[in-house]
């Protein structure tokens, strides 16, 4: 008799059937991942791969996980945000016998405890690959090894509640695990593929400092990720989160978007399409000029604070909306973030204010003068905390890139140095090509003489690496 599978933590395993139905629907909308299963499944290119995955545990991610398994990998999974898990998706993955540790609304302590579970394989082994979103799984290994090697002073110098919890976990592991635990982890990991802008920044910082422990592929800057997921995904999911959270009429409201990168562009478009009058702030003169040429009013946060009804941060930076900005806002202004971390808004400064929880991930905060502010998802990702994240189709492109990156790193161990790489343009174009038929796109084909005339191959790639799209 087979032992009952118990290597998981989910909210309710009884949600598995519901999750499985939604996974089936998502598969129809994820042609890239399904084509990848069909092409690579017989070859089993990930056989022997033990992937530690830290990425929002959604229905779409479930399709990614099962694609990795179909290609031969063993997988353990956690969510990379305390509010982004879809509990029915986690239940379906657990019911399929895949270890997953993710609950929507989990505490920060739970979040980091679950992250630690990623690295404790049930057979006593360790992972040999990381699939990351935001870099927390990667940082777990790097900061753990740093402390294990004797540099422990930073463990007592936390700058946030989350850092305090994370550093306490490292201290505990150093006491409980055999000596050399983190060194073994670092040695066994052959590479990481990183999903998002914030995590990529962390990787490049470590590479620049000479501290990157294993090769990395920057999936975020694949064109079929950043120009689609970041842009078109946010264009659909931002207003979904705001509407589900507040039921507010968006048409006619004044909205302020901080940042006009790909995520900011999608966010501004989302609000404009909903009928908002949109303002934008930027530090980059090129992005500021782009925003102005698109017809947005480009202002500072100081200008916008007393005027806007809705505020969205999309910068990947810290302290974008400060306590001073919040004090200057209208009564019941709506404040949210669509960047990866919660420090874009100075939520920690609100700790001693009066908090009234209206419903999950919607809080009304009252200032000493009686003014109120509506904060969504405690300043964490609004589209995943208050809604269901990006649609399946656009996530198919991102996750096909992730799958190809995992195959590339695992199949070519020793080829890559401890640096950050991007996938070649041939694969970027392949990912795009896999999604065309689903939406009825017919490509024009170059003749040989036309290809020769512009100096490309008939089958591509069609653009130079420096082309910006």
UniProtKB/Swiss-Prot annotation:
Catalytic activity from the UniProt record: S-adenosyl-L-homocysteine + H2O = L-homocysteine + adenosine
Pfam families: AdoHcyase, AdoHcyase_NAD
Subcellular localization, as worded in the UniProt entry: Cytoplasm
Leader peptide range in chain numbering: none
InterPro entries (alphabetical): Adenosylhomocyst_ase-like_sf, Adenosylhomocysteinase-like, Ado_hCys_hydrolase_NAD-bd, NAD(P)-bd_dom_sf, S-Ado-L-homoCys_hydrolase_CS
Residues holding substrate: 58, 133, 195, 225, 229
Textual note on the cofactor: Binds 1 NAD(+) per subunit.
Enzyme Commission code: 3.13.2.1
Annotated metabolic or biological route of this protein: Amino-acid biosynthesis; L-homocysteine biosynthesis; L-homocysteine from S-adenosyl-L-homocysteine: step 1/1
NCBIfam families for the chain: ahcY (TIGR00936), PRK05476.2-3 (NF004005)
Protein family membership: Belongs to the adenosylhomocysteinase family.
Name listed for the protein in its UniProt record: Adenosylhomocysteinase
Lineage start: Bacteria, Pseudomonadati, Pseudomonadota, Alphaproteobacteria, Hyphomicrobiales
Gene designation: ahcY
């Amino acid at each position: 008799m087979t032992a009952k599978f118990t290597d998981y933590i989910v909210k309710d395993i009884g949600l598995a059937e519901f999750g499985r139905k939604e996974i089936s629907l998502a598969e129809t909308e994820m042609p890239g991942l399904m084509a990848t299963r069909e092409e690579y499944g017989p070859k089993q290119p990930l056989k022997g791969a033990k992937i530690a995955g830290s990425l929002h545990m959604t229905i779409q991610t479930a399709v990614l996980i099962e694609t990795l398994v179909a290609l031969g990998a063993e997988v353990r999974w956690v969510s990379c945000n305390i509010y982004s898990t879809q509990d029915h998706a986690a239940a379906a993955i657990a019911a399929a016998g895949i270890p997953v540790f993710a609950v929507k609304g989990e505490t920060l302590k739970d979040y980091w405890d679950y992250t630690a579970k990623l690295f404790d394989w049930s057979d006593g082994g360790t992972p040999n690959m990381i699939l990351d979103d935001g870099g927390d799984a990667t940082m777990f290994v790097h900061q753990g090894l740093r402390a294990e090697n004797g540099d422990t002073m930073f463990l007592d110098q936390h700058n946030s509640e989350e850092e305090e919890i994370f550093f306490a976990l490292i201290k505990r592991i150093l006491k409980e695990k055999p000596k050399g635990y983190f060194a073994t982890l670092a040695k066994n990991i052959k590479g990481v593929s990183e999903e998002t802008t914030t995590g990529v920044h962390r990787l490049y910082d470590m590479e620049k400092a000479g501290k990157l422990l294993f090769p990395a592929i920057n999936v975020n800057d694949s064109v079929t990720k950043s120009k689609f997921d970041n842009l078109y995904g946010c264009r659909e999911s931002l207003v979904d989160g705001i509407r589900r959270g507040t039921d507010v009429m968006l048409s006619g409201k004044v909205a302020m978007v901080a940042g006009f990168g790909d995520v900011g562009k999608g966010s501004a478009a989302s609000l404009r399409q909903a009928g908002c009058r949109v303002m934008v702030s930027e530090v980059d003169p090129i992005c500021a000029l782009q925003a102005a040429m698109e017809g947005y009013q480009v202002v500072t946060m100081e200008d916008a604070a007393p005027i806007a009804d809705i505020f969205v941060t999309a910068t990947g930076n810290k302290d974008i909306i400060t306590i001073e900005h919040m004090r200057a806002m209208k009564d019941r202004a709506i404040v949210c973030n669509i960047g990866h971390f919660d420090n874009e808004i100075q939520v920690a400064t609100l700790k001693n204010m009066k908090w009234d929880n209206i419903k999950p991930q919607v809080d009304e905060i009252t200032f000493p003068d009686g003014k109120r502010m509506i904060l969504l998802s405690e300043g964490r990702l609004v589209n995943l905390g208050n809604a269901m994240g990006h649609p399946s189709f656009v996530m198919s492109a991102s996750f096909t890139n992730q799958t190809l990156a995992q195959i590339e790193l695992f199949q070519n161990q020793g080829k890559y140095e401890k640096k950050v790489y991007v996938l070649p343009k041939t694969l970027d174009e392949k990912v795009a090509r896999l999604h065309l038929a689903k939406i009825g796109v017919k490509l024009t084909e170059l003749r040989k003489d036309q290809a020769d005339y512009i100096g490309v191959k008939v089958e591509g790639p069609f653009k130079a690496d420096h082309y910006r799209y």
